[in-house]
Amino acid sequence: MLEADHPSTKNNDIGLILGPAFIALAFHLAANGFGGYGIFRDEFYYIACSKRLAAGFVDQPPLSMFLLAASRNLFGVSQIGLRVLPAVAHALAVLLAGLIARKLGGRRTAVTLACLAVLTAPIIIGHTNIFQMNAFSHLIWALAAYLLVLIAERSRPALWLLLGAVMGLGLLNKLDFLWFGAGLAASLLLTDMRKHLATQWPYAAAATALLVFSPFIIWNASHGFAHIEFIRNATAGKYSGLTRLDFLAGQALLLNPVNMAIWLPGLYFLFFDRDGRRFRVLGIIYVIAFVILLANGHSKAEYLGPAYIMLFAAGGVAWERWAARGRRIWAVAGLAGASVLTSLLILPFAVPVLPVETFIKYSAALGVKPATAENLRLSVLPQFFADMFGWEGLAQDVSAVYRSLPAEERPTAVVFARNYGEAGALEYYAGKFPLPGVISTHNSYWFWGYPKKGVGTVIVLRGNAEDHRKSCAEVALAAVHSCRYCMPYENDLPIYVCRGLRVSLHDVWNEERSFD
């Protein structure tokens, strides 16, 4: 596959792009159809959000929730059904990497190397193996980068308007797309792309992006800028332990250390190669995003992940040209092989492809300790995997407590969950086990509120009896939920039955609001 190129082959290479894209799709469907550890904590919450569609949510813009609502109707909410669209997003990102490489001047070798890197990069394959905003960030960044390459090649008004729409969708998916916009703005000032400022089209693109994004702005303004509060609390709380060193190390580890040999030459190509310089807008976008995240001091390394697709494409071109000058195609083949092999070694840490006990042994053999980006105590699994365990058992235990209530109490009973994972999981399994309505003061659940009347018995998760007696006349420990591989704070979780509320739920809502 990695062979010397000939101009006549350029139009016959679509299979080199479609092949890896199909492999990406097939891998995710197989991994989730025949394996996996279960539905991830956040996915339960996202399902709940998708059933309460709005122009915004406390912890995310609305685009991915609308996609999930459509996905639920098409594919259901099983493990594999939830993850079809992220799998498609990965496949399309691979496809766009190949197309970008071709537009940058690459041929078969460049396309192959770019597609392989995006196919196997641990952070990309991990993000797209579950339903989350990050899965679509990779696709949207890649699509916006491709449109910029087309604009640099031949500017057309329609391309600018399409770019504006894509940028608006990027912001509606996740606010980190602001960094892409900041890099583009810098490029319009610092490069020969400034010639476009003499036309109306960059401004039309910005206006289009703002128009597409405006529903979330309006939602925030009408909800006390809840998303800003969420970002502030998360940065000061659960992400406060992250350091700049963590961020820098993650750029190597999460993308696969071998892949540095692909994306670093790609960055060089965009800034210093005679043919690559006209596309240096892509390099500037990466650098601006990198600087913003590094300056923040508490950024998760994965935040920069979507920016590497365009660097992998450029790196493929750089390697192809270097190899062609000295008939060094063997070196490119060796790099591709090393990249794939190393990614396969890292893969079990990104996607649950091994039985859990096998993974624990594999991790120990490599000397890798469980990790988290948040200030939390860990189990024998990294947080990403641990948060896939224990949810059905929790629903069973709460259901048993609910069924133990006298028949006359059940119609007015509710469950008070302390975080969105617990609340979302209980709602998810309500179709399988008898469960009452669920309320919570965490993130968007706070806005979704509580029954305004008719609340009697409250089943409360967490806390201690002494504190609960301040709010309830009668408190009884009804059960303790245990789970083997879950996060420690979800293990040995007390489940209380509280009767005779001493305070109104209105007061509880004002005191217990938690946006983080």
Per-region residue spans from a language model:
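Membrane-interface alpha helices of multi-pass inner-membrane proteins
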Residues: R52, A114-C115, L147, L159-K174, ...
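Transmembrane-lumen/periplasm boundary regions of multi-pass, lipid-linked membrane glycan transferases
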Residues: L169, L178-F279, G297, L347-P352
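Short acidic/glycine- and proline-prone juxtamembrane loop motifs at membrane-interface regions
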Residues: I123, N129-S137
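Specific aromatic-rich, kink-prone transmembrane helix
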Residues: L96, A117, F136-R154, L159-M167, ...
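Membrane-interface transmembrane helices that cradle and orient dolichyl/undecaprenyl
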Residues: S8-T9, R102, A144-W160, R194, ...
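Transmembrane-helix signature of polytopic, membrane-embedded enzymes
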Residues: A4, G15-L18, F22, A97-T120, ...
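Signature aromatic-anchored transmembrane alpha helix within multi-pass, membrane-resident enzymes
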Residues: E320-Y362
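Transmembrane-helix motifs of polytopic, lipid-linked glycan transferases
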Residues: V84-G105, L143, L147
